[in-house]
């Protein structure tokens, strides 16, 4: 069952301007250490940051909160599964909200799609609730 959908379009030029103007202050306020490390290694760091910014906005929309109700930028981070597929790792208020919207007996799975075509970066997030796997004790 789908419990949340969000999308966002980010202007890479706007993210570049924020990086130029605010530098580390912007990077550390909005992005996790993993996101900063990954983006800083890219030839086009601004595009990488813009995709991650769009992912956070899309995830906040899928959670139904936006950037309020205890959900902060660094509570959501883009990470990659072993396959390389991107997903979101949630902590703090974002994780609490995910737990609130996940029905009992279900496990939330976050699906993330990222793309960019200068000057835009785009992200789609779908939060799906699937039946929880039975525990070994059952």
UniProtKB/Swiss-Prot annotation:
Q: Which reaction does it catalyse?
A: apo-[ACP] + CoA = holo-[ACP] + adenosine 3',5'-bisphosphate + H(+)
Its primary localisation, in coarse terms, equals cytoplasm
Q: Which GO terms describe its cellular component?
A: cytoplasm
User: Is Transferase among the key words of this record?
Assistant: yes
Which keywords does this Swiss-Prot/TrEMBL entry list? Cytoplasm, Fatty acid biosynthesis, Fatty acid metabolism, Lipid biosynthesis, Lipid metabolism, Magnesium, Metal-binding, Transferase
Location comes to:
Cytoplasm
- Swiss-Prot/TrEMBL cofactor(s): Mg(2+)
Q: List the disulfide bonds.
A: none
Q: Which InterPro entries match?
A: 4-PPantetheinyl_Trfase_dom, 4-PPantetheinyl_Trfase_dom_sf, ACPS, Ppantetheine-prot_Trfase_dom
What role is this protein assigned? Answer: Transfers the 4'-phosphopantetheine moiety from coenzyme A to a Ser of acyl-carrier-protein.
Instruction: Give the similarity note.
Output: Belongs to the P-Pant transferase superfamily. AcpS family.
Please give the name of this protein: Holo-[acyl-carrier-protein] synthase
Native source organism of the sequence: Phenylobacterium zucineum (strain HLK1)
Taxonomic placement: Bacteria, Pseudomonadati, Pseudomonadota, Alphaproteobacteria, Caulobacterales
């Amino acid at each position: 069952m789908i419990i949340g959908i969000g999308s966002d379009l980010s202007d890479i030029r706007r993210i570049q301007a924020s990086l130029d103007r605010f530098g580390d202050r912007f990077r550390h306020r909005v992005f996790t250490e993993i996101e900063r490390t990954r983006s800083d290694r890219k030839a086009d760091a601004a595009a990488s940051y813009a995709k991650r910014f769009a992912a956070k906005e899309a995830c906040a929309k899928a959670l139904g909160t936006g950037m309020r109700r205890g959900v902060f930028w660094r509570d959501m981070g883009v990470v990659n599964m072993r396959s390389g597929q991107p997903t979101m790792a949630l902590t703090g208020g974002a994780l609490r909200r995910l737990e609130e919207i996940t029905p009992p007996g279900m496990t939330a799975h976050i699906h993330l799609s990222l793309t960019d075509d200068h000057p835009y970066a785009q992200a789609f997030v779908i939060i799906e609730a699937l039946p929880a796997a039975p525990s070994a004790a059952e």
